[in-house]
Amino acid sequence: MSGQVPEYQFWLLAEISPVHSEKVINALRDYLVMGYNRMEACGRHGVSPGYFSGALKRFQRVSQTVYRLVPFYFPEAGHEVHRGE
């Protein structure tokens, strides 16, 4: 996933994510958008690797939730709608 997220998509996800620390968001951007490895991204912004991993999981959870919401807004997208899990 490193370096594979478009910048605009990243900022939209950041807007609705539970991650609020500017330095953590910048480290996530370096990793997800710019393609830095985890250690480089953490070092550039003074974020501990453990905290970064937790923030990355929360960020990925937001992305997965948005993906699951798509069929409710765009039924033609072809995703199967599951009502509850």
From Swiss-Prot:
Keyword check for Transcription: yes
Positions of transmembrane segments: none
Gene3D superfamilies assigned: 1.10.10.2690
Domain of life the protein comes from: Bacteria
Magnesium is among the record's keywords: no
Classification via Pfam families: PapB (PF03333)
Keywords from the UniProt entry: Activator, Fimbrium biogenesis, Transcription, Transcription regulation
GO biological process assignments: regulation of DNA-templated transcription
Function: Regulates the transcription of genes involved in the biosynthesis of F1845 fimbrial adhesin.
Protein name: F1845 adhesin operon regulatory protein
Organism: Escherichia coli
Classification lineage: Bacteria, Pseudomonadati, Pseudomonadota, Gammaproteobacteria, Enterobacterales
